[in-house]
UniProtKB/Swiss-Prot annotation:
Organism (species): Meyerozyma guilliermondii (strain ATCC 6260 / CBS 566 / DSM 6381 / JCM 1539 / NBRC 10279 / NRRL Y-324) (Yeast)
Keywords per UniProt: Membrane, Transmembrane, Transmembrane helix
Family, as annotated: Belongs to the AIM11 family.
Signal peptide (UniProt feature, chain positions): none
Name of the protein in question: Altered inheritance of mitochondria protein 11
Gene name linked to the record: AIM11
Membrane topology type: Multi-pass membrane protein
GO CC aspect terms: membrane; mitochondrion
InterPro entries per the UniProt record, alphabetical: AIM11
Localization per record: Membrane
Segments passing through the bilayer: 30-47, 76-98
PANTHER family attached to this UniProt entry: ALTERED INHERITANCE OF MITOCHONDRIA PROTEIN 11
């Protein structure tokens, strides 16, 4: 039994979707899964690097001072790099997950979707129906006159 037949059997809407739509959703899923794998890898790397830098004193050493061979600069660089990788991978996972959920594949689609979600078309219609103030009307009429070639007619 094929995947499409299984979807039709349980009456999923995806069964009647086009192949292009299915490919698009698979691509979005793959991006999310890849960023999830990168996040898991980065978290594991951060854990290992933290454990490797851990200082465990011997029996009669004090635990309030690091050994003299300890390099604070290297430790800071590793911490900043690890934090940056973790932040980037988690951010990419959030972004790709949101785009997969909203069915967005390009920046242009994201702009359209946000405009729709935030009521951009209705607000644009309301703005177009509002009356102009006197100064704006004078400027608009002047520009229309210039475009129509009436700039020589001085009244």
């Amino acid at each position: 039994m094929s995947f499409t037949n299984l979807l039709e059997k349980y009456d999923f809407k995806l069964a009647s979707a086009s192949e292009e739509y299915k490919q698009r959703r698979k691509y979005q899923m793959a991006l999310f899964m890849a960023s999830g794998a990168a996040t898991i890898f980065a978290a594991r790397f951060a854990f290992k690097s933290t454990m490797a830098r851990q200082y465990v004193p011997t029996l009669f050493q004090g635990n309030h001072q690091p050994p003299t061979s300890y390099n604070f600069t290297t430790d800071a660089a590793v911490a900043v790099g690890t934090g940056t990788v973790l932040c980037g991978s988690v951010s990419s996972m959030i972004i790709f997950g949101t785009c997969w959920m909203m069915d967005v594949s390009t920046f242009k689609e994201f702009g359209w979707r946000m405009k729709t979600v935030m009521g951009g078309y209705e607000k644009q219609k309301q703005l177009a129906q509002m009356p102009l103030d006197e100064e704006s009307e004078i400027i608009q009429n002047g520009l229309n006159d210039i475009l129509e070639g009436k700039y020589d007619d001085i009244e």
